[in-house]
Regions:
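Active-site activation/catalytic loop segments of kinase-like enzymes and analogous catalytic loops
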Residues: 59-69, 130-166
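ATP-binding pocket architecture of kinase catalytic cores
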Residues: 1-56, 94
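Glycan-recognition and catalytic cores of secretory/periplasmic carbohydrate-active enzymes
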Residues: 32-44, 51-55, 102, 107, ...
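Active-site acidic catalytic loop and adjacent metal/ATP-binding pocket
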Residues: 27-28, 86-134, 141-145
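An alpha-helical support segment within catalytic cores of ATP-dependent transferases
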Residues: 32-35, 44-45, 52-53, 57-100, ...
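Flexible, glycine- and charge-enriched loops at secondary-structure boundaries
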Residues: 10-17, 75, 79, 143, ...
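Hydrophobic, secondary-structure "cap" segments at the distal end of domains
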Residues: 170-171
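Charged catalytic carboxylate motif
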Residues: 19, 23, 81, 85, ...
Length: 171
């Protein structure tokens, strides 16, 4: 049973989201390794988030969304200008980039397993910014959430992460 189906039926979703945020924070506390063992070929390399990866993700906008509204010539013109601006922005990004990032941490990849939460579909994971997965959870396109609920989830995450950082900085 996915948390998507659970959340669809719930009126008060905050308690469930808190449980999912708690698991996310546990995952984020794990020191990521760039190479992990797997059963198929021995090891798998988890890459770091990079400008190249960010460009691949923004390309989705040009490849999938804009063709619904514009011709190829206009898309190429917009893409060229936008890529130039984005390249500058990506160079100036300065955020913590040393966390395990699932990259698909949303309700359909979170399973109810007894009283625990199971996480599936992690083959696209990277080492990157911890907020990526939080945004995937809060802004899940499959579920409508109010601004109020999004803020409550975000505030809960901040409160919990601030406690973690305070504890870690005192060690």
């Amino acid at each position: 049973l996915t948390y998507y189906k659970i959340l669809l039926k719930q009126k008060n979703k905050l308690t469930t989201y808190k449980k999912l945020v708690d698991l996310l924070l546990k995952i984020q506390k794990i020191k990521p390794k760039t190479k992990i063992k797997n059963i198929i070929n021995g090891t798998h390399e988890i890459k770091k988030y990079s400008s190249k990866q960010l460009h691949r993700e923004t390309d989705l906008f040009f490849d999938w969304y804009l063709p619904l509204f514009l011709n190829k010539k206009k898309i190429l013109k917009i893409k060229k200008k936008t890529k130039k601006i984005l390249s500058q922005l990506y160079k100036n990004l300065n955020f913590p980039n040393s966390y395990f990032v699932h990259r698909d941490y949303h309700s359909q990849n979170l399973m109810k397993v007894g009283n625990r939460v199971g996480v599936i579909d992690s083959q696209d994971a990277l080492i990157g910014n911890p907020t990526y997965d939080l945004v995937s959870l809060i802004d899940d396109v499959r579920l409508r959430t109010s601004k109020k609920l999004k803020k409550q989830i975000y505030d809960y995450y901040l409160k919990k992460i601030n406690k973690i950082y305070r504890v870690n900085s005192q060690k």
